[in-house]
Structure formats: C-alpha cells, structure tokens
Amino acid sequence: MRIEQLKKVTAPSAQEICVLATAGGFKLTAREGASPAEFLNELIAAKSLNEAVQFFAFALPAREAVWWACQCSRGELSDPIPQPLQDAVEAAETWVRKPTEEHRRAAMSRAQATDFKSPAAWAAAAAFWSGGSLAPENLPEVPAPAHLMGCAVAGAVMLAAVKSEPQLADQKRERYLASAIDIANGGNGRLASAGS
C-alpha cells in the first residue's frame, strides 16, 4: 500500500499533525519537512500500523475521521448487535451526514448508554468531541480541546482491530488504513470484506 496523495488532509506537514497527536498523549514524531503522505508511507513501510492509525485519526477532517471510526466499528459489530452499540454508531453516522448541534449531542448520549468498551461508543464520542461545547446545554461554553476527537477516533479504530480475533489485528489495521486512504481521497471508505 503506497499513498500518493491525501486530498482531504489539509495540514501541509506531518509535524503539524504530530503536535496535535502528542497533545492527545500519542508519541508520533515525523521528520522535518515530511508531508502527511510521506510520513504515512514511512510508518506503513516500517510496519508501524498502530502509529499510522493514530496519525490518520488526527490528520483527517472531523466528519471524515468520525466516518472512518464508524466504518471500522461497523466491521466489528456481530449479530445480534446489542441495541446500545447499534444506536451509538448510527448516531455518529447521523452526525456525519448532518453535523448539527442536536446530532452532536445525541451522539454523546448514545455513547454514554454503552459501557465505552466498544469501538461504536468511541465513534459516537468522537462526533461529540468534534467541536462545540462540552458543557451541558444552557451553561457557559467549554470548548472541546482540539486533540480530543482524534483521541476518540484512534481509540475506536485501534479497539476495532483487537476487539475480536486479536491475532488478526495487523490484517485489520491494513484494511482500516486502506479505508482511511480512500476517505482521505474523497471515497466512502467502505471496508472490503476480510477475505478480499
């Protein structure tokens, strides 16, 4: 997998994205002058797939990042899907399609109805943390820190890779990265089945 371009990633340098990821507690260090695509290619070539996932979580714009978390989360939901998890991922997808304040807050409500041990919960939390206020409505605004959404997206995707069949985590990460690359270039990021 070689990345030539990332149309939707607007940061001119990988270092800029690494600063945001570092604020979220991740240890990503890009070489000076590396573009986001160059840095991702370096991570993938070094088989640093977890770090590549983390980098993408902070590199993608908010809606695209949450959509990616939803795609990876859906891939790990198995029948019968517990209703709170279904509700959480659907709330996050609704926010992606129509990013209103009402949908953003509904996503967090659905995330809180889970045990926060699933990728779906973190995808929904990412939608809430994408912007706006963290405070309850009608209280003074408490802006979400810029790194919070990326942390939730990274958590959703990394958890999706190991939640079931952890021995296949690297193969899942490769699929998830292919999805992120597609999203970053204007695609829908739908995951190919594991066998394809």
Predicted segments — roles?
Residues 122-130:
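Alpha-helical transmembrane segments of helical membrane proteins, especially in multi-pass transport
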Residues 1-117, 132-196:
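Short, glycine-biased loop/turn motifs at secondary-structure junctions and
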